[in-house]
Amino acid sequence: MGCIEHKKTPATDDTGQDYNPYDVMEPRLPGKTPVDRRNGKHVKANDIPPEGVYLPNNNILAPHMKSPEYVQLSNAAAITLGIMGGRMYRCECTRCLNLLLTYPEGCRANCAYCGLARHREAERDYADRNFIRVDWPAVPMRDIVDIVAKDPENSPFHRMCISMITHPRSEQDTFDVLEQWTNKIDPNAIPVSILSNPTTMTRDDVQRTKDLGADIFTVALDAATPELFDRTRGKGVQSPHKWKKYWDIMLEAKDIFGPQKFGAHIIVGMGETEYEVLNLVQQLVDLGGHSHMFCFFPEDGSLMDHLPATPRDQWRRVQLARYLIV
């Protein structure tokens, strides 16, 4: 379900409201990006070859890394794999290995709450952007596969998830990354999920992910209503995503993957009412799908980094209601 940081998420905001209303949660408009910073132009022009693991560092020019040869993974996953130093606080490992596709051009969408959004190319290279409040080292995919393939039955990871981004190569590279994994690691030992990019996908793409070994297909709706989706993920922030296309692909996944093998991510506290988010949860249940809920927390560098985190009371009410629904 996700969690909140109690010290920074009071039960109510400064005005005494115990929810984030729509009129307060207005993203900033994206600014213009200098021509020489667009589409990873300077990274590709310098063409610095990568050398093994790349740890995000905004003080240097990022190497020219791209999927399917390279993927990014969270600090927690990198620590668990043993490819970077550090210890997990109050937990020895993370159980899901999330692999994020990566390119010098970065994600071409511009979602208001996301640290990977296109507008950030004005300030930092794609490989150096924070996402979900942590860094994501870039690692050769073959290295990840080789480490996990040594003993998948006893791996700390219980699942692997490929996270797509909005990029012209995203579909084919997802297939390639998935094949690299399943060629050496039995999906029965470590099942595979796809966190999809519906904007550029077709039904055939959805079918191919299943044919290659994925057993769960998820769509990151994130916003609970069409209006909120458009405001934070669509034309409101000069981004290409459309609510209808996301639903179309999710319904294709329903047909292809079957009950409880498809679903959606939902972020609570971006301006929706509690009725609206729970109505979405109910729709997913009625379809035979699942929901993954997260509470909004402002991501540094995003177009919503000035807005309040989800009040604790709102988050707990929605969590409890979802529990009763599902």
List PLM regions with ranges.
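Surface-exposed amphipathic alpha-helices with a cationic face
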Residues: 178-187, 210, 250-258
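Short beta-strand/loop segments at the ligand-binding rim of alpha/beta enzyme cores
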Residues: 186-196, 257-266
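Core AdoMet radical
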Residues: 118-173, 188-205, 209-247, 290-292
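Conserved glycine-rich "GG(E/T)P / GGGxP" loop and the immediately following alpha-helix
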Residues: 158-184, 269-276
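Intrinsic-disorder-associated, low-complexity terminal segments enriched in Asp/Asn/His/Tyr and depleted
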Residues: 6, 14, 18-20, 36, ...
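Conserved C-terminal portion of the radical SAM core fold
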Residues: 216, 221, 225, 243-303, ...
